[in-house]
Amino acid sequence: MTISDVPTQTLPAEGEVRLVDIGSLRLESGAVIDNVCIALQRWGELSPTRDNVVMVLHALTGDSHVTGPAGPGHSTPGWWDGMVGPGAPIDTNRWCAVATNVLGGCRGSTGPSSLARDGKPWGSRFPLISVRDQVEADMAALAALGITQVAAVVGGSMGGARALEWIVGHPDRVRSALLLAVGARATADQIGTQTTQIAAIKADPNWRNGDYHETGCRPEAGLKVARRFAHLTYRGEIELDSRFANDGQGGEDPADGGRYAIQSYLEHQGDKLLARFDAGSYVILTEALSRHDVGRGRDGIHAALRGCPVPVVVGGITSDRLYPLRLQQELADLLPGCAGLEVVDSIRGHDGFLVESEAVGELIHKTLRLAEDRSSRPW
């Protein structure tokens, strides 16, 4: 696969999902995935010079549907409604916002539930991927649309890891970046929680080593447990205790075998994910997150970050227990293009980057001002 500036496919209509064919993709591991498609949406018009693209990068279970109502092909509303649109922080009167469903996902892009060349689901044959592979796939999808440089990359959590790989691996292709609620590498705590989630899925008898897609049975119980555990790491401890304390759910009494309110809440989160996500994708993407390390093959984190010239805004959440502030502080300290850590005060934990709209919107404004400042300079 080579990056060309000659478009071979066209941008979708605003809000429409387009499956962009990028051909074969050689992974960081050396494995090759054939016939790769990346699901892509856009909002706003592409400028004649193709220099106003803002890539919006989703987190683990997100997709390309950043904004807009639920509807055909979108079982849920946009995951960042209010951040993209006319007059929004990513103002589509000025910018062309583009989002993909990540490689390995299950919302249109090639992943374990997709059909391989033999017409059967990839399942357990789907190779291990990395965050860098996801970035290469995104870049190839943009290149197929005639876009080889972007004004900004914006992402939180796994999206933040992708944004970091964009600016370190391809600094000549991006003018600015917003890194939210992420770190330079996966920590032992993150790897521990993530491998435990994977273990829950693989312990489900319906997992069948990942080859369950044609059996009519999915590892539903395992995926729901994984999501319940993950969701605890996404929210703040104070928030959860203030909402649920040790209360029973409705009229149920935990002392008599009834459920706790927090238990019911987490069960609901598991049910919601089950309705829209594939367990195989959950495993593949979570494994990629556990291997995230921007310093791998680049003489370590310090050298990788110090060598990145891209202007960047780094933001963290005060109550984030999955990606604590010390991880964003490291990024802010080592990236030459960062003026200092931006702290969002929130009790909502890691998910603060999704729900603290006013504060995060201001960080987006700062990021796009950096892109504007560089727009008149040679790349």
Swiss-Prot record:
It is found in: Cytoplasm. Substrate binds at residues 227, 351. The keyword Transferase applies. Disulfide bonds: none annotated. Pathway: Amino-acid biosynthesis; L-methionine biosynthesis via de novo pathway; O-acetyl-L-homoserine from L-homoserine: step 1/1. Pfam families: Abhydrolase_1. Transfers an acetyl group from acetyl-CoA to L-homoserine, forming acetyl-L-homoserine. This is Homoserine O-acetyltransferase.
